[in-house]
Swiss-Prot record:
Name assigned to this protein: Uncharacterized protein ZK632.9
Residue numbers spanned by region Disordered: 1-62
Pfam families linked to this entry: Phospho_p8
Basic and acidic residues bias locations: 28-37
InterPro entries: NUPR1-like
Length: 62
């Protein structure tokens, strides 16, 4: 079961999900996918640092 869910999640990340643009000012499906998978200037550094600092805080609480 989990492999099907994992496949669906991977497919969703690749395609960006269904195209739900109905109003003006919204991104198109291809724009969403392009923006999501574009390389960030700082990379994933912020996420890694945040995860590490949260882990340290949790260990200090115990």
């Amino acid at each position: 079961m989990s492999s099907t869910a994992e496949e669906m999640a991977a497919a969703f990340e690749q395609t960006g999900g269904p195209d739900l643009t109905t109003g003006s000012g919204k991104r198109t499906k291809s724009d969403r996918v392009e923006h999501k998978h574009a390389s960030q200037p700082g990379g994933d550094t912020r996420k890694v640092v945040q995860t590490a600092s949260n882990g340290e805080a949790k260990r200090k609480e115990k």
